[in-house]
Amino acid sequence: MTDTTNSIKHVISPLARQTLQDRDLTRPVAGKRPIRLLPWLQVVKIGGRVMDRGADAILPLVEELRKLLPEHRLLILTGAGVRARHVFSVGLDLGLPVGSLAPLAASEAGQNGHILAAMLASEGVSYVEHPTVADQLAIHLSATRAVVGSAFPPYHHHEFPGSRIPPHRADTGAFLLADAFGAAGLTIVENVDGIYTADPNGPDRGQARFLPETSATDLAKSEGPLPVDRALLDVMATARHIERVQVVNGLVPGRLTAALRGEHVGTLIRTGVRPA
């Protein structure tokens, strides 16, 4: 038998013999942005609090989305809402770890997505699971103008254990997808006009001041409640494509349409991305 040991070809790569913790390996490309995979994509995250309101909120929003389809190709992502809060409460009482709570909440977001997709089914819109969004979104959006998915990132049992409540929820997941695809934009649709200095529906609503524009850095310093995930502010700091996110009131007809057309109708949150 011929000894072929010495004929094995070595892979010529600076990564082959180095630790991936060596920052010198990525320094030559550190200042370059990754390519935009889907630069025409608009990502719209529908908050669970909007879905919780039922037909009064959902039907006008569905009609607005239907009218937007000729203008944009959309990835519509849904949050979980009050049902996730209930499952968190039960799970915490039972002592479930954060990694067990995360997929439970994600399933509630998926239910909202199925509802929204059913309402838009006549337009060729369907619900797709995480693997399809990750690997086949382009082909789906070449066949139809929009798809619906869960906004929760699939951390599930890999969720960070530092908190009892899963920190990476719907807003964070929507942003991670939008930035990974190099989307044209991300609009977060909630039940408030945007970001306030205090909860506009809480006991301190009299002191709540509306913020038409702010930054992830400034919001991270605030201690009050926010209508978006705190973890969203962390991932914004290391974003590669999405320069700003707009939070708008989905209960006001026309706000989402205006936002997707580039109008300032809510709160603009600047990320850590520098303009190209």
From Swiss-Prot:
Superkingdom of origin: Bacteria
Localization annotation: Cytoplasm
Q: Which CDD domains match?
A: AAK_UMPK-MosAB (cd04255)
* InterPro entries for the chain: AceGlu_kinase-like_sf, Asp/Glu/Uridylate_kinase, MoSto_subunit_alpha/beta
Q: How does activity depend on pH?
A: Optimum pH is 6.5 to 7.0. Above pH 7.1 molybdenum is released.
- Protein's UniProt keywords contain S-adenosyl-L-methionine: no
What are the recorded GO MF terms, alphabetically? Answer: molybdenum ion binding; nutrient reservoir activity
Q: What induces it?
A: Requires molybdenum.
Cellular component aspect of the GO annotation: cytoplasm
Which SUPFAM superfamilies does the UniProt entry name for this protein? Carbamate kinase-like
What are the UniProt keywords, alphabetically?
Cytoplasm, Metal-binding, Molybdenum, Storage protein
How it assembles, according to the record, is:
Octamer consisting of 4 alpha and 4 beta chains.
Similarity-based family: Belongs to the UMP kinase family. Highly divergent.
As for what it does, the entry says: Intracellular storage of molybdenum. Binds polyoxomolybdates. Can bind at least 90 molybdenum atoms per protein molecule.
The identity of this protein, by name, is: Molybdenum storage protein subunit alpha
Gene symbol?
mosA
